[in-house]
């Protein structure tokens, strides 16, 4: 799914002339790795350079893969999204402050902005959702997804609800995330946000990049179509990953 999102973001930027291939232009993004890997892959294929800003506790395997794909990887301390030094805000700042050199006067800098761009939602509404519906021959009772940016859950849920109102879209929410309460009760909040209990890692889970404590544009677009949410513990997630590996051959 991240390949779809990355391609949609880059394609729309090219249509809007925010990016021009083979001009020395740079793509900047703040990510825990997955979207960055897709952006770095496509940057190589389409003639761009790529700078990915990650939290410094991201899995080393992701950072290594990003570097091998040619991306410049910058690691920053994990901070809250309101902090200008949060990895997403750092990526935006780097894009805004970047200047072309005299040898590449047509080069540009583009901030992918995966959390807020409509291209994320559109990729899943226009592609992932229809692919699921087609490949299952319309036999979909429920769709369950976590929320990183909210794009997958929102885009797919919107499409499936459109073709079959009886489909049940469900958010799977990890410890520390506020999505469960937002969907069930209309309030984006988790008990770990109470005064005196806040932590360095607000979404406290072994599942990197999943969970939100703010309403992103991509999650907001899908809220009318998401029917329910379920809390999933780390133990449940790890046990299911082992089950899928053993029984379905899926390495997650």
Regions from the PLM with identified roles:
Residues 1-24:
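Positively charged, low-complexity intrinsically disordered leader regions
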Residues 6-13, 39, 91, 156, ...:
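Buried hydrophobic packing segments
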Residues 19-56, 139-152, 250-252:
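A short, small-residue-rich loop immediately preceding and capping a beta-strand
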Residues 26, 35-97, 179-192, 216-218:
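Active-site-proximal loop->helix
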Residues 53, 76, 114, 146, ...:
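Generic beta-sheet signal
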Residues 88-99, 108, 162-252:
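Active-site/ligand-binding loops adjacent to catalytic centers
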Residues 104-148, 155-156, 218-228, 235-250:
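Active-site/ligand-binding-proximal alpha/beta "capping" segment
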């Amino acid at each position: 799914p991240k390949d779809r999102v990355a391609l949609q973001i880059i394609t729309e930027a090219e249509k809007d002339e925010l990016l021009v291939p083979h001009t020395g232009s740079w793509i900047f993004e703040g990510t825990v790795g997955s979207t960055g890997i897709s952006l770095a892959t496509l940057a190589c294929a389409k003639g761009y350079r790529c700078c990915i800003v990650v939290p410094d506790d991201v899995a080393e395997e992701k950072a290594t893969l990003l570097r091998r794909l040619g991306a410049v990887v910058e690691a920053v301390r994990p901070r809250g999204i309101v902090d200008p030094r949060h990895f997403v805000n750092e990526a935006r700042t780097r894009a805004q402050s970047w200047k072309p050199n005299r040898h590449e006067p047509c080069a540009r800098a583009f901030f992918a902005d995966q959390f807020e761009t409509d291209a994320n939602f559109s990729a899943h509404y226009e592609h992932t959702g229809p692919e699921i519906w087609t490949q299952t021959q319309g036999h979909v009772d429920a769709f369950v997804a976590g929320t990183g940016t909210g794009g997958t859950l929102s885009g797919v849920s919107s499409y499936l609800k459109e073709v079959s109102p009886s489909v049940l879209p469900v958010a799977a929410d990890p410890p520390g995330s506020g999505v469960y309460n937002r969907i069930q009760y209309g309030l984006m909040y988790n008990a770990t946000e109470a005064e005196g209990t806040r932590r360095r890692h607000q979404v406290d889970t072994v599942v990197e990049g999943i969970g939100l404590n703010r309403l992103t544009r991509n999650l907001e677009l899908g809220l009318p179509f998401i029917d329910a949410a379920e809390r999933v513990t780390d133990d449940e997630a790890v046990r299911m990953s082992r089950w899928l590996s053993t029984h379905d051959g899926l390495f997650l």
